[in-house]
Amino acid sequence: IIHNLFTPRMLPFLKKKINYDHIAWVTYTHPEIATFGVNQSQLRERKISYELFDYDFEHDDRAITSDSTYGRSKVYVGTKGKQKGKILGGTMIADAAGELIQELILAKKANLDIKHIFGKVYPYPTASRVNKYTIRPWFARKLNERTKRIFKWLY
């Protein structure tokens, strides 16, 4: 942004267009509200195919131990074409949501597939595991019924 304030007058050919799809913001209330990327209405307007993943912190182990179970995470993931499996945007309402959402912001900016977040090993219990839990249903669908029963029995 600073670049665009000074450069156009001096060197107009260096002017860069700002991509607002990568802008994030946090509202510092209690709890915090952190948002990044595109929202649901923008996705519909652009006719982008997506799936919404929603996770409530009520039963999250770290949220329970830190007495901050009031929280929710919503993440939009592309479902078709080059955006399939890519994080498109999201919102988190929680204590320290501005810090918890950083991993998702980086994944969006770097155009990482959600398997990179899901495949990451998080220390237990870590607050940022909510990012993995939010997108878990994407991968759970791919398991066959026998595997699901085994995991249900184990966990």
Residue ranges and their predicted role:
Residues H22-A24:
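Short, glycine-/aromatic-enriched active-site segment of Class I SAM-dependent methyltransferases
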Residues Y28-N39, R44-Y155:
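Flexible, glycine-rich terminal cap/loop adjacent to redox cofactors
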Residues I1-Y20, I48-S49, K108-I114:
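Internal hydrophobic alpha-helix adjacent to the cofactor/substrate pocket in enzyme cavities
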